[in-house]
Amino acid sequence: MENIFDKAQNLKLQERLQKLNRESKPLWGKMNVCQMVKHCQKPLEVAEGKIKLRKSLLGFLFGKMAKRDFLKPGELRKNMPTVSTFKIRETPDFDSEWLSLVSIVKTFGEKGPEVIAEKEHPFFGELTDDEWGALQYKHLDHHLKQFNV
């Protein structure tokens, strides 16, 4: 399974990010490209410990099952619900948010799993380094495909 910590796969993500521009249009969903590049930073910031999410009853009850679903081979479903913390309602500046996303992705490739602040995800529960890396890759890949890159 692809992993954001794998240097070659990380470079491919960076190359795909280079193809985005403020005129990029989604193939599905409600987010515009400016919102998407900011949204994609949020799960990475959770991994880094920059965003603290509380554990929820929903995560306690369904987190392990959802983790299996997210980590299974294949693409994520389109139009999945978004955690309210990750919803971007305003239209942020594309250039600054794009630069931030590229920088974070690059850091994940350079530092590897040492960027992970806590092994326990607030929704999915305990994750290995490989699971953290695979989840981050899969989420980014999903949204890059959403914008046809």
Model region roles, listed by residue range:
Residues E23-L71, E118-V149:
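Short, contiguous alpha-helical
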Residues M1-Q35, H39:
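Long, hydrophobic N-terminal alpha-helical segment
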Residues E2-F5, L101, V149:
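Metal-centered catalytic cores of metalloenzymes
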Residues D6-K7, S103-I104, Y137:
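Membrane-proximal intrinsically disordered regions of secretory-pathway and membrane-system proteins
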Residues M1-N3, E45, D95:
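Domain-scale detector for complete catalytic domains at protein termini or as standalone homologs
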Residues F70-V115:
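Acidic/histidine-rich alpha-helical segments that form the ligand environment
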Residues N10-L13, G112-K119:
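Short alpha-helical hairpin
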Residues M1, S24-K25, K87-P92, T128-D130:
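Active-site rim elements
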